[in-house]
Amino acid sequence: TWNRERAADMGCVLGQEARGRGKDVILAPGINLIRSPLCGRNFEYMSEDPHLISEMAVPLIRGIEEQDTAACVKHFALNNQETRRLDVEAAVDERALRELYLPGFEAAVKEGKTKTLMGAYNRFRGEHCCHNHYLLQDILRGEWGFDGVVISDWGGVHDTMQAAENGLDIEMSETSDFDQYCMADPLAEKV
């Protein structure tokens, strides 16, 4: 709609509702680029236009976070399909990455000042996004200066040590024995 005021209003309402229920974080907005009509998450994404995503995400995030609730921008990055989403390789070149897939996330970090960000399930350049050094360290923390919290999508981490070393702060597990399994030696010594 390009209506930034309505986006800010929506963010305020979401933030108020979350705060009223005692919630500290909203797992939104989802700002991936809509690339295929078959993507099962299109209903939660904003647009196929990276500029529109950037323009609408910033006031939405600000509206949420003005209510003392953190917005968790997701799914970083290149999460544009549901088929084989846990292991699909997103094969895009650097230009497409920078011009199409990252502008919304960059705006969310630099202008929206989002406090949290969620990694994606898919792979990029051979590494899962939830522990991808290039995305998390080089771009997100290095270039953009993000100092907030990065969490994984549920079950999105395939190497806990690599995730911790590459900048993931919180791993969301799908198993009930996560602590016993993943925090066994030698990882426990590093935490």
What are these regions (language model features)?
Residues 1-191:
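Glycoside hydrolase catalytic-domain context in secreted enzymes
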